Structure formats: C-alpha cells, structure tokens
Amino acid sequence: MAQMTMVQAITDALRIELKNDPNVLIFGEDVGVNGGVFRATEGLQAEFGEDRVFDTPLAESGIGGLAIGLALQGFRPVPEIQFFGFVYEVMDSICGQMARIRYRTGGRYHMPITIRSPFGGGVHTPELHSDSLEGLVAQQPGLKVVIPSTPYDAKGLLISAIRDNDPVIFLEHLKLYRSFRQEVPEGEYTIPIGKADIKREGKDITIIAYGAMVHESLKAAAELEKEGISAEVVDLRTVQPLDIETIIGSVEKTGRAIVVQEAQRQAGIAANVVAEINERAILSLEAPVLRVAAPDTVYPFAQAESVWLPNFKDVIETAKKVMNF
C-alpha cells in the first residue's frame, strides 16, 4: 500500500494499463511533454515513448475524431479533454458517434475509449474550467459516466474504464486532485463500473452524492450525528449506469433521502436519482426526497464561487427538512 493523492492514483492506473496493453494510447492537449496541465500524465511519455503518449493540437473535436478512428483500428484510446467545460466542442464525436457505433454495426465494432477530463469548482477557475456537465453525457445511451471521490476509487475505476469495450467518460474533480491522501494498493485492481459504495452507514436518512459532494455529505453526516441523526452516505461513483440496487436498498432501510450534486439543479443527476427512488420505493418513504444543487445560473466568477457552490451546511439544512417533515 502507498499513500497517494487522487492525481497520483490516476497516473498509477495509466502507467499500469500502458504496461499491460500495447494498444493503450494516451493523448490530448499538453499530456505528453508537460505531463498534463495537472500533471496526471507526468513522466509517461518519457517512459513509454511519443508513439504511446503524445500531444495534440488545441482542438477537442479533433481529439474525439482521432479517438474514434484509433478505436476502429483496434487501439484502446485514452484521450484527455483538458477541462470538461470544453466538451461542447466534441459532443458530436461523443454522443453522435462513440456512443452509437456498437449499435449501428450490430456489435461488430466496439468503442473502447476512455475520455478523461477534469471538472468541478472550488479552486477559483473560470466557468468553462469549473462547470459540472456530467448530465449532458449521462443522458446519452451507450456511454458510461464515472466520477470517483477518492484516490482508491479513482485508480480501480480508471483501470476498469480502460479495459471496458464501451466508451467511458471519466470525470476527475479538480478540488480532489491533491486535497488529501489515501492508502492505495500499489499493484493493479479493479472496481466494477456501475457499483455504488456506502461511505458511511446510517439508519435515519440516506444522503446520496458523487464527486466532491461526497466529502461535503460526509462532513454533514458527522455534524448531524452530534444532533442524534444517523445519516448513511452513498457514493454513486458511477452516474451512468446508476446502481439502483444499492440506492433503493439504502432508502428502504432509512425511509428518507436527499440527493446532492454540485451541478445546477435543472435536469441533473440528482433529479434522475429522485425519480428512480419515487418510482421504486415510494411506499418506503416517510418524507419527500429533496435535492441539494447549485442555482440554475452560469457558473459565477471566482469571487462568488463560495456562495454559489453547495456545501455541507446546505446538506445539513436539507436533511433536517426531510427529518422534520
């Protein structure tokens, strides 16, 4: 075991897969010589060569098209979109092509592409560097969308994503890259895509979250415990497909739930989770399922970021509303 930050765990996963499979290729803006803007690919070009880890022009649409072509030729591309706010430039490649080629060809061709991309707020970056746009891609059939909250999860899920024969969007929260360390196995291991994780056991209310909001939820749960409220925290880890079994099992146990996301409230992952709970566990509920989310505005300037982003206080307030219903 080694103490790793999330970005170190990601680099470790990439190194393992480059060693394991000669068809794995890593490319994107600045990922080669400079090792990525956040150094997630640092040292990989020197170790594996310019044919395996290489830089691209500043053109997300080109990165997406290259990934599709390489996948059709039998490679296992791992492109990086430098910030997920720039995903608009490559949406046709992702949703119009990658997600559909297996279906269009009757399963004759696969798209073993893992798109890595930093996202999320809390580090005072401009809006296109901070947006949480996971809802855009989670809606598209044929894609898997993974959002880890810990170094351990990041490494195991990234290895699983690279080995998957379908396209995976692997989103890495900026705030979590170096915010803490965790013991991570030094060898290879996998975590199943589509499997949530109960990060804290509880009996009174279920708090469902993903990404950086898992840590806000855990902080809220610790505060709620002081007031006699036992909160269970479920980390989705994968937002498409959802782990319905774990979600419903927890809600049926506690009878109450809130869903927490960093993204804007409208048409988000949280709304989808709430709908699934209402459709499958309505008779187990003691109160309505509520959401914690950002306002439905464009991501603000850095000066207003702290009041715009959801935090543990919002989680506590919403949990108490449900408990007092």
UniProtKB/Swiss-Prot annotation:
The keyword Nucleotide-binding does not apply. Keywords: Oxidoreductase, Pyruvate, Thiamine pyrophosphate. It catalyses: N(6)-[(R)-lipoyl]-L-lysyl-[protein] + pyruvate + H(+) = N(6)-[(R)-S(8)-acetyldihydrolipoyl]-L-lysyl-[protein] + CO2. Thiamine diphosphate binds at residue 60. Its EC number is 1.2.4.1. Its cofactor is thiamine diphosphate. It is an enzyme of class 1 (oxidoreductase). One of its GO terms (molecular function) is pyruvate dehydrogenase (acetyl-transferring) activity. The keyword Isomerase does not apply. Heterodimer of an alpha and a beta chain. The pyruvate dehydrogenase complex catalyzes the overall conversion of pyruvate to acetyl-CoA and CO(2). It contains multiple copies of three enzymatic components: pyruvate dehydrogenase (E1), dihydrolipoamide acetyltransferase (E2) and lipoamide dehydrogenase (E3). This is Pyruvate dehydrogenase E1 component subunit beta. It comes from Geobacillus stearothermophilus.
